[in-house]
């Protein structure tokens, strides 16, 4: 005997597990809000005082963060139809972004004009986000991890290297963003630099998850996420190419971003090939 077709279809859908509907809704909300915000930052990087939660200067920084938001649209959008075992790393990674972001926000409240709704929206977002994603992680803490093939050792090392690079960047930006910005082709204000450090800690977590978990299916979303964020950073740099600093520093900046993009894409590809052999 064969199972009814409706049961077969249910078994084939990755979102039929209990609790998946709220997760999909949350991922979709992040993708939509991030994509819209990123579009504004890329199109009008010099006018953030009119529509953003705080004045995000200089324009190259606004475009860089805008590119990160657009990357979030693709990363969280792609996660919508993935099973929990494959998006767990991304969901956990949001805490590495939102908890530090909430901390630096309260450390720099002076940059916000709380007479504007956008300022309140920023604070509420970074209060609600870790609570929402943290609750999902807690409720699904007993869910099994993916049972699949390993990430090839060389790419596990590369993932660890990516995590180390982004960790160093995050620590430097949190500790002294103005001094750390000396290696960049644009200046960083204190709050803007620390916000960028929060994005770096998010990417460090994704790389670390891939290196530690090292399961072919489980690491694909985190590794592809790093690649998307590097592509977004390159897009942001090209958007304000003329505003970037000295030629040598500008070239080195793009070279580093391109190298990180290639390494993350190569690792994602290796994970995908390894998973397809099962």
Which residue ranges define each predicted feature?
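Core segments of alpha-helical transmembrane spans in multipass integral membrane proteins
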Residues: 60-78, 96, 191-211, 228
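An N-terminus-focused feature that recognizes amino-terminal "leader" regions
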Residues: 11-90, 182-188, 248-249, 267-270, ...
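Hydrophobic, ordered structural segments
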Residues: 71-144, 150, 236, 246-274
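Short, intrinsically disordered terminal tails adjacent to the first/last structured region
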Residues: 1-13, 276-278
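Membrane-interfacial loop-to-transmembrane alpha-helix junctions, especially the N-terminal start
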Residues: 23-28, 84-94, 156, 217-225
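Juxtamembrane "helix-exit" motif on the non-cytosolic side of transmembrane helices
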Residues: 43-50, 106-114, 173-181, 236-244
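Surface-exposed interaction/gating patches
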Residues: 20-39, 142-213
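Hydrophobic alpha-helical membrane segments
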Residues: 92-105, 199-203, 222-238
């Amino acid at each position: 005997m064969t199972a009814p077709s409706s049961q077969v279809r249910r078994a084939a859908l990755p979102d039929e597990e209990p609790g998946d509907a709220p997760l999909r809704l949350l991922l979709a909300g992040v993708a939509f809000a991030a994509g819209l915000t990123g579009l504004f930052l890329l199109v009008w990087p010099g006018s953030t005082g009119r529509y953003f939660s705080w004045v995000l200067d200089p324009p190259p920084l606004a475009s860089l963060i805008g590119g990160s938001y657009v990357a979030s649209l693709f990363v969280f959008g792609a996660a919508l139809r993935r099973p929990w075992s494959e998006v767990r790393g991304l969901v956990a990674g949001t805490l590495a972004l939102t908890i530090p972001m909430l901390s630096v926000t309260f450390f720099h409240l002076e940059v916000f004009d709380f007479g504007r709704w956008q300022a309140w929206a920023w604070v509420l977002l970074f209060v609600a986000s870790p609570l929402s994603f943290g609750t999902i992680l807690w409720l699904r803490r007993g869910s099994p991890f993916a049972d699949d093939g390993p990430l090839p050792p060389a790419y596990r090392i590369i993932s660890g290297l990516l995590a180390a690079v982004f960790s160093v960047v995050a620590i430097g930006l949190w500790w002294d963003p103005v001094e750390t910005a000396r290696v960049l082709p644009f200046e960083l204000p204190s709050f803007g630099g620390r916000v960028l450090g929060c994005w770096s800690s998010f990417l460090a977590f994704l790389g670390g998850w891939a290196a530690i978990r090292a399961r072919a299916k489980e690491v694909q979303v985190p590794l592809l996420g790093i690649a998307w964020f590097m592509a977004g950073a390159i897009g942001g740099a090209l958007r304000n190419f003329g505003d970037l600093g000295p030629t040598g520093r500008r070239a080195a900046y793009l070279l580093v971003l391109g190298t990180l993009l290639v390494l993350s894409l190569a690792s994602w590809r290796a994970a995908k090939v390894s998973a397809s052999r099962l």
